[in-house]
A protein has these predicted regions:
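N-terminal beta1-alpha1 cap of cysteine-dependent amidohydrolase-like domains
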Residues: 1-115, 125-133, 137-146
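Conserved G/P- and acidic residue-centered "switch" motifs that form tight phosphate/ATP-binding loops
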Residues: 118
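The feature captures the ABC ATPase H-loop/switch
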Residues: 121
Length: 146
């Protein structure tokens, strides 16, 4: 039997989730994203909890072969790109923001491939210096994209 190369390790940053029946926050990612990495990319998915203060980002980036940035319920908070404040009813995920944005920059610096879907594309944009309209459907001249 020939030697097999190890599967690439693809990091999937988690969103912080609050479930009504639990008093503690959960960290998770949608199964469709995990299966896309596992089955579609034939890679080993690794969910990265949103715990920014606990990571050495250069070390973390050096341990993964790719970074898959998923969609999520929350938008990137506007203070990361000097945008106007969110309204009070906007869903937030500051732990994900604080984990993902520096990790993206480090992956780009180290040449680790980065892929984004939905919110993940917003994260790449903001991490690399871009701005957002977090409610683009409310901007004059834009169609409702939802």
């Amino acid at each position: 039997m020939p030697d097999r190369l190890p599967k690439p390790l693809v990091g999937i940053p988690a969103s912080q989730i609050f479930l009504p029946s639990h008093s503690l926050a959960q960290h998770g990612s949608g199964e469709r994203y995990i299966r896309a990495v596992s089955d579609g990319a034939v890679a080993l998915p690794m969910v990265i909890p949103a715990l920014a203060d606990h990571y050495d980002f250069p070390d973390l980036a050096s341990r993964i072969d790719g970074l898959m940035l998923t969609g999520g319920r929350a938008n990137v908070e506007p203070h990361h790109y000097d945008g106007p404040p969110f309204p009070d009813d906007e869903i937030r995920d500051p732990l994900r923001d604080n984990t993902v944005l520096p990790l993206i920059r480090e992956c780009v610096e180290q040449g680790v491939p980065v892929f984004g879907s939905c919110r993940g594309i917003q994260e790449i944009n903001v991490a690399l210096g871009g701005t957002l309209f977090y409610r683009v459907h409310e901007q004059p001249g834009f169609n409702d994209h939802r």
